[in-house]
């Protein structure tokens, strides 16, 4: 049985800091794209600039894994907190599978949903699946990567079908390998991964697409706002590709 962490001063301070940087439930969908946009453009500026030395590209390549996983972790942690703030029944089901600490239900400056988020490592597929199990009825990532998100807007057009697994049948392996590389980069300054452009292109696409597809289905479930695409008087949920994230011809409007 998974244990709920004790409310130490350090943990409370950390959760309050995370709360202060977290946007509202109506904004966090676009927050992921904006976070991705800033770092994706930086990485690609190294790739496109012929004046950059190879060692600078290698450094940027290593750090890109840290960024990809950071965006992923932030998104799924924030969604977890939002969902468990909105749905008390969902929280009660999760609590039934966990072992509370002595101070779990004591009054404090942090919400129960925030405390529960610290019981899971969102950089680990098994942990993420367990955190979202009650929301989706099990196999959360496998389900959203196999489920059709169409019709939706992609690359300025309406796609009748959009299934992550059909685009990347090895998404699970790519995610796990990216987690592994990120862990080595963060904890071993001597580690130098081989620069594999084909792999990193797959990884950045998957780490951009899966949170957006998750957004699509979670927004449907909780009737939340999402980014939409207008075509012939109809509105469709929109999914950004890497090429669109890198372009300068789009803005988010209300």
What function would you assign to each model-found segment?
Residues 38-56:
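Short amphipathic alpha-helical segments and their helix-coil junctions
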Residues 50-60, 64-176:
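Helix-loop junctions and short alpha-helical segments
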Residues 6-43, 157-162, 166-254:
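Polyanionic, low-complexity intrinsically disordered segments
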């Amino acid at each position: 049985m998974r244990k709920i962490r004790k409310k130490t001063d350090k943990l409370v301070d950390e959760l309050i800091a995370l709360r202060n940087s977290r946007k509202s439930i109506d904004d966090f969908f676009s927050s992921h794209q904006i976070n991705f946009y800033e770092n994706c453009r930086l990485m690609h500026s190294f790739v496109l600039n012929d004046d950059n030395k190879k060692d600078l590209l290698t450094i940027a390549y290593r750090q890109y894994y840290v960024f990809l996983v950071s965006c992923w972790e932030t998104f799924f942690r924030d969604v977890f907190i939002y969902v468990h703030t909105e749905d008390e029944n969902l929280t009660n089901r999760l609590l039934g599978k966990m072992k509370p600490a002595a101070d779990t239900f004591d009054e404090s400056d942090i919400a129960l949903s925030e405390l529960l988020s610290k019981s899971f490592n969102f950089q680990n597929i098994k942990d993420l699946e367990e955190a979202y199990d009650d929301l989706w009825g099990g196999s959360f990532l496998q389900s959203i990567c196999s489920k059709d998100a169409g019709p939706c807007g992609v690359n300025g057009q309406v796609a009748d079908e959009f299934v992550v697994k059909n685009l990347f049948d090895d998404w699970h392996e790519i995610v796990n390998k990216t987690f592994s590389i990120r862990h080595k980069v963060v904890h071993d300054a001597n580690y130098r991964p081989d620069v594999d452009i084909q792999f990193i292109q797959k990884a950045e696409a998957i780490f951009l697409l899966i949170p957006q597809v998750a957004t699509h289905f979670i927004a449907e479930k909780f009737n939340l706002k999402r980014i939409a695409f207008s075509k012939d008087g109809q509105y469709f949920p929109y999914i950004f590709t890497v090429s669109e994230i890198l372009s300068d011809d789009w803005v988010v409007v209300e």
